[in-house]
């Protein structure tokens, strides 16, 4: 089930994007064009002879492309999509005991959980697999459409389809969505925050990602530049605390506390940690 709360693109500038496609995929490209247009994105269709690595290198600007695997974001010779199917090996290894995120979010209790910083949806995919009922909130129309496409593909996968009904995609601004829950006096068990730009450690040094800031994240940073508007984080914490019994914030291990607020509890891993705030 997908939900449009009407505020997904309210604060975003007008967007225009190319979709590159081979002629065999024209119908799919036209479908994505119509969907994106309904979400405020003007899309120019660009049929090409061959969508391959050479073409992507020669056309480095941020764009979309369509092939037999659906919709992709491309730039600088790379392309990416949330690709939930690629997460299957990780999911099959995961248990409530082995996953720190499961302990932090109490997934064994099958919570209703709002993921207010959707990203590529991989953490939500894991949490849904382990039993949570997920409300996955994303306001950027292109990223939301990529997530929607990944979920649609997952619904046809024998393994992933078993728990896709536990993931609800919501096209909305996370702050507005949390405010709406508060105004309607609705609560959830958990709000999960994984800000894309944690930036600084305790010594105010910029945090370096792993040598390969994943290809996916490189392209996401191009789509969602750190311009203040897209840097989801500090302002969501207080909103989340109003509607959830438990707020869990994922941070790089040495990052400063979100909004400089010390958590009530922490779970520490080698590369990241989970900070907990309780109501």
From Swiss-Prot:
The coding gene here is rsmJ
Report the GO terms under cellular component: cytoplasm
Residues binding S-adenosyl-L-methionine are: 138-139, 194
Catalysis performed (reactions): guanosine(1516) in 16S rRNA + S-adenosyl-L-methionine = N(2)-methylguanosine(1516) in 16S rRNA + S-adenosyl-L-homocysteine + H(+)
Which keywords does this Swiss-Prot/TrEMBL entry list? Cytoplasm, Methyltransferase, rRNA processing, S-adenosyl-L-methionine, Transferase
Q: Which source organism?
A: Acinetobacter baumannii (strain ATCC 17978 / DSM 105126 / CIP 53.77 / LMG 1025 / NCDC KC755 / 5377)
| Family annotation (Pfam families) | SAM_MT
Query: EC number(s)?
Result: 2.1.1.242
Q: What class of enzyme is it?
A: transferase
Where it sits in the cell: the answer is: Cytoplasm
This chain's protein is named Ribosomal RNA small subunit methyltransferase J
